[in-house]
Swiss-Prot record:
Biased composition (Acidic residues): 27-45
Pfam families tied to this protein: CRAL_TRIO_2 (PF13716), Macro (PF01661)
Residue span of region Disordered: 20-46
Limits of the Macro domain: 54-234
The protein's name: Ganglioside-induced differentiation-associated protein 2
InterPro entries in alphabetical order: CRAL-TRIO_dom, CRAL-TRIO_dom_sf, Macro_dom, Macro_dom-like, Macro_GDAP2
Species whose genome carries this gene: Danio rerio (Zebrafish)
Protein origin, superkingdom: Eukaryota
Family, similarity comment: Belongs to the GDAP2 family.
CRAL-TRIO domain: residues covered: 342-490
């Protein structure tokens, strides 16, 4: 108890400003977060395009009115429950836990012993004891390793989701969240913030009718990140909603905010074609036709005509570059607004570790691309969405051609269109393209394609006959290889490996 007349150290959440209150909506988005066109006409075109695309996170004043960003100690919040981040034995020593224990008193430690631990991603509840909060919800965030990024994302989502589920089950009115992903667990702050904000947003949309106040308690280090990303998921006006749309990440999760995990999403149907929304999309030609017929794609302009104008001297190189950049920005904007979870579920394109030079490794699994059964425009959008932030620095690509069939082979026209659309950084920063387990036919096709269609790629393509050859460029622990590729390589190349061993 505080001495009579003394000022309480605890903070009443009802007195804190909510996110919907005007604070200069544009402040957090100035500078780096905007598309800055040099000409006013170009800005108008992009604005008109943004106006025609709906954001997956619309302006909702009722939700914004529940959100509070608080720079301070979560242990001091006077609300129904606060969140404590700990380890699996609930004995972690970190600034958040230490403060909660200090203010709650020794009874909390005794109570935690009775819980017998908590697994990563789970949440358990105790009394608040000497805290102003009535309850403490304890959860365990994941340890982050780039190689197991998907697992870490799913675990962190589970932390937030399970905390919110407990709050719902106990009809809690207000909840104070700490930053669950501690520095000790090495989770990138910005990545973790995306998961936190979108999970809470989706929960409030779908199940948050009883929650009146939800506080994000942050430190000086985390506050700028939260202020930067909050407008993406909690826009405070229609204008901010439009401005934030192109800034959303590739993976915005499903309807609950959960990261899309391919192993859980892929389902084998007896007649997969029947699952398509459009029964006419049964050929590669019709898929490619969608790219040009879509209203969004039509803004792109005729690439061949642009080349012709350049050859005729009617369009300067600078003007052509600006036109290309505008076209790419439109595709990128569309990619960020589209639901691409069905393409992500194929796990045909994903990021893994780094090569021997420290460059990011992107993997393409040819066998996982059912060309005849998917919307190729969405496949193109997914490639742009995933690769856009990767290509800002040097990277390499590993393509597994292993056990692919005719139904997995991308049409040359589609590949050429992809090459023409992508930003210059895609081509400039690609240092190597490793073509693993090529066939004679694929080698010939690749030679023709890189010689006559995209000559700038020719010197970067390297045919890799076996995984041992690949491992001279990328260490085994730095690349996630599909099991069927490992099995195939072991079966087909075992005589080669045996001969190598015998020669040593």
């Amino acid at each position: 108890m505080d001495p009579l007349g003394a000022r309480s150290q605890f903070v009443e959440v009802l007195n804190l400003p909510t996110w919907d209150q005007p604070q200069g909506v544009q402040d957090e988005l100035d500078g780096e977060n905007h598309y800055e066109e040099e000409e006013e006409e170009e800005e108008d075109n992009l604005t008109n395009q943004l106006n025609s695309v709906n954001s997956p996170f619309t302006f909702r004043q009722d939700i914004n009115n529940k959100i509070v960003l608080f720079n301070g100690d979560v242990a001091l919040l006077n609300c129904t429950a606060i969140v404590n981040t700990s380890n699996e034995t609930l004995t972690d020593k970190n600034p958040i836990s230490d403060s909660i224990h200090r203010h709650a008193g020794p009874e909390l430690r005794d109570e935690l012993l009775k819980l017998k631990g908590c697994r990563t991603g789970e949440a358990k509840m105790t009394e608040g004891f000497d805290l102003a909060a009535r309850f403490i919800i304890h959860t365990v965030g994941p340890k982050y390793k780039a190689k197991y990024r998907t697992a870490a994302e799913s675990s962190l989502y589970s932390c937030y989701r399970n905390v919110l589920q407990l709050a719902k089950e106990h009809a809690m009115v207000s909840v104070g969240f700490c930053v669950i992903s501690t520095v000790k667990r090495a989770y990138p702050v910005e990545d973790a913030t995306h998961i936190a904000l979108r999970t809470v947003r989706r929960f409030l949309e779908n199940h948050g009718e009883n929650i009146e106040t939800l506080v994000f308690a942050v430190s000086d280090v985390e506050e700028p990140v939260y202020r930067k990303l909050l407008p993406l998921y909690y826009p405070r006006s229609k204008q901010e909603e439009r401005i934030s749309l192109p800034l959303l990440p590739a993976d915005i999760g499903n309807s609950e905010g959960e990261p899309v995990v391919p192993e859980r999403q892929i389902r084998i149907a007896e007649k997969p074609v029947n699952l398509e929304d459009d029964p006419e999309d049964d050929s590669l030609d019709s898929d490619l036709g969608l790219v040009g017929s879509h209203a969004f794609a039509r803004m792109e302009g005729d690439v061949d005509k642009q080349r012709k104008l350049i050859l005729q001297g009617q369009m300067s190189e600078v003007a052509q570059q600006k036109q290309h950049q505008r076209n790419y920005n439109r595709w990128l904007c569309k990619a960020r607004a589209e639901d691409l979870s069905d393409i992500a579920a194929l796990k045909a394109l994903y990021q893994t570790g780094v090569d021997l030079c420290g460059r990011t490794v992107m993997v393409v699994v040819g066998r996982n691309i059912p060309v005849m059964l998917i919307d190729m425009e969405k496949a193109l959008l997914y490639f742009i969405h995933v690769m856009d932030h990767i290509t800002v620095k040097e990277y390499v690509m590993v393509y597994f051609h292993t056990l692919t069939g005719e139904h997995n082979h991308l049409d040359t026209d589609f590949l050429k269109k992809l090459y023409d659309i992508v930003d210059a950084k895609f081509k400039k920063n690609l240092r190597a393209f490793y073509f693993v387990h090529p066939t004679f036919r694929s080698k010939v096709s690749t030679w023709f394609f890189t010689t006559f269609s995209v000559s700038g790629l020719k010197d970067k393509v390297h045919h890799i006959e076996n995984l041992q050859q690949l491992f001279t460029c990328v260490l085994p622990e730095q690349i996630d290889i599909p099991p069927f590729v490992l099995e195939y390589d072991s079966r087909v190349n075992s005589p080669y490996y045996s001969a190598q061993s015998a020669g040593l």
